[in-house]
């Protein structure tokens, strides 16, 4: 990893992210001055600011520091050759603020200023954000979005489970795995015990077969359970609202499952194109889900990790 020092840059700039704006502190390294400005959360405004910096410091490098490693701000600034992006741990800024500005008064230095001070004093210890290739960034985003959707599906599955327990708990016993189309389609077709008890035996068997549930013992156990099941409640004041909620949640759940499948296909394709695919495929326990995540964690710029502890802290 290339080592940087303050002398490499014409200016040090700290950027503090807020909901609708970026608070910016600019420190020309040839002076003791600090300039403050605000840029709106708009791509055009950020581009105008970046180009203004380039004009004011022609043919010179500018060091940018912020508390982010990725996100809209990083994506927007990474394309400018005159900017070198550093990241500082938010905890470090918080500790610095607490140590040197304990009053909490309105005239205390901003986080953007504190970031500049940390950059000026500890540049050699900060990580540089070096953009990955477009292919690696694509894979990284896909893996991240898949992880997010999987968590959404877990949360939604828990809501469905909790709602079914209110009026139709037997359905949870008939299907061990909830993140499946057979479970979703069953609930959509027979959203209550009363409804499924009206179904003919052959109709149920055909349903199971059409969803690749071919084990006779499992299907017969389901049929026996359906036949002998007793309603938890006959109170329409409980059944009707909970059934309506389950139907809404199941519809959302199926959309999520299809979305995850779509991302899986995209991840498989993006991962297949990676040069180091064979290396990560060969790792013990690295299957179709884990191998792409490991590759994203390592990235193509592996020199950015100083030790195994830094790599271990990476979320994939």
What is each model feature region?
Residues 1-316:
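A detector of single, family-specific signature residues
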